[in-house]
């Protein structure tokens, strides 16, 4: 059984700075909270090559000495400016843009020009800009990727590269890669097959790794596996940038991924690999195939499971109970894809850890897909879905037909179908359950099973609400009902920080249980009383640090860690030391 949560994490009030610049400005980073160390980058680049490298470029911030040493005197304006002055200029320009996608494009151009300034911008304004750089705006950016594309980022491995993937992997110019996020573009958010346009998802996820987990942006790599697309619109669009043929399937697909995994792990043997937005059953098949071979995990199945489990456990606390009360819950899950199955399996693991048998845990779930209940007579289910089949109830029945029989206490929405949590369902659940968990998790916002306003109105304010996309708090009958974003950004950055800092050799399932329990423990009684179960997203670095510490300790306990804190440091000090800060490095030119 996992350690009681009180022993493995501290409440949010004890991990967030209470005074100083961070408390006043509510940004992600404060010098007093980290071990500041001047970054040094050794390069053989000079002149325009420096200015054209977003990892080295400082724009107008190069000093006179740097201009001489780097051969850029006369190539930039003469008076050097600080990073702070550059940030203020860019923020002023960004604020003039009203359209969310245009804001995304502006930030994309900034990232491709000056990464340090880009991350300074995001970190200073995370709550404002997180919906721009990731959900919901990133969904539109993926759909229009081939229309707004201006500059490449990351790597593409296509069907044209079969038999040559090791050579392709060698083309990446940096030897040190800590985190890779890879997608095949087959199931982008709730938008379906977007092919090569899915590249915006790994780019966005890695921005969150940097901002939330403090991973060095020089050491991240977004990748698309372009195995074709079944999207007819893209197949017929002359501007589409990916391979215009139907997707590889079956053995051909798995042979392609096998070659890529071999090539990429040979090139970057220490990298954590996050699989992202692969359709079922490929997502689960790849997870089961590689989980014990390399340091990898599936974000949709496992990270989503971790943060949803954290939401459920925090709901137990908000009701005045303990984590063990999860054994009494009844779950109605709409959606049986990779995310739906992954979420429910993670919750099952927790129920078992609290003392139930696995069969007893599965019996707490009623899962539905587009054909209705996973029940008796359904012979179309994948093995991963069959364990959730209700053998005593005829398959295909709708949630409305079974609602009064099930009497759920927690609603899980992973269907990508809006408005499925309707008035009848929400009002009925709230009529017999104190603070039912209402979790419409589908992204983007347009696919959410209900809005926060609908959930509050139809439950008369009796609920704990957590959604995949952000919703504002709701004013209801003279009080403010807090909303929560049940977003993977609370989980995977801290997981990555712990795995990278310990150089773990694999990612056991226990990782996500530890993560969930840490996050669920962070809400204070005062927060929980208002319906708020998570710290604000602008405190993500503090949350990620707590998660990372426990993940690193778990790796050490399980003998999968290969790197440890230096003598005189504990894990907390070591992880703080490792967290990257947006400050300009000292650039040393050397013939390598």
From Swiss-Prot:
EC number: 1.1.1.40
GO biological process terms, semicolon-separated: malate metabolic process
Binding site for NAD(+): 187, 300, 443
Classification via Pfam families: malic (PF00390), Malic_M (PF03949)
Positions of the record's site feature: Important for activity: 300
Keyword Transcription: no
Subcellular location: Hydrogenosome
Names of required cofactors: Mg(2+); Mn(2+)
TM annotation in the entry: none
Domain of life of the native organism: Eukaryota
Entry binding sites for NADP(+): 182-205, 335-352
Name used for this protein in its record: Malic enzyme, hydrogenosomal
Taxonomic lineage from the root: Eukaryota, Fungi, Fungi incertae sedis, Chytridiomycota, Chytridiomycota incertae sedis
